[in-house]
Amino acid sequence: MKTLLLTLVVVTIVCLDLGNTRICDDSNIPSERTPKRCQGGYNICYKINFPTPGYELLQIKGCAARCPTNPRFPKAECCATDNCI
């Protein structure tokens, strides 16, 4: 009985991953959501909108270790909860 209980606890810990990984949207299409589990250490979800004249809005979304910054690109929106963007 103790062995069964211990096995269940271990399986639960492995399956739940103790909440150490973030889930972010990985789709580059604004109206589509594609949740993706981030790698360890990547705890920020980000989204960068690129205006494209005559076309739909282009987005880049994903996981990051910190909020991306680049003066040549539009400002990134960042957050630190699952599926927040």
UniProtKB/Swiss-Prot annotation:
Family annotation (Gene3D superfamilies): CD59 (2.10.60.10)
Range of residues in the leader sequence: 1-21
Keyword flag Translocase: no
Superkingdom, natural source: Eukaryota
Disulfide bond entries: C24-C45, C38-C63, C67-C78, C79-C84
One GO MF term attached to the UniProt entry: toxin activity
InterPro entries: Snake_3FTx, Snake_toxin-like_sf, Snake_toxin_con_site, Toxin_cobra-type
GO cellular component: extracellular region
Key words of the record: Disulfide bond, Secreted, Signal, Toxin
Subcellular location: Secreted
Family that this chain belongs to: Belongs to the three-finger toxin family. Short-chain subfamily.
Name this protein carries in UniProt: Three-finger toxin MALT0044C
Source lineage: Eukaryota, Metazoa, Chordata, Craniata, Vertebrata
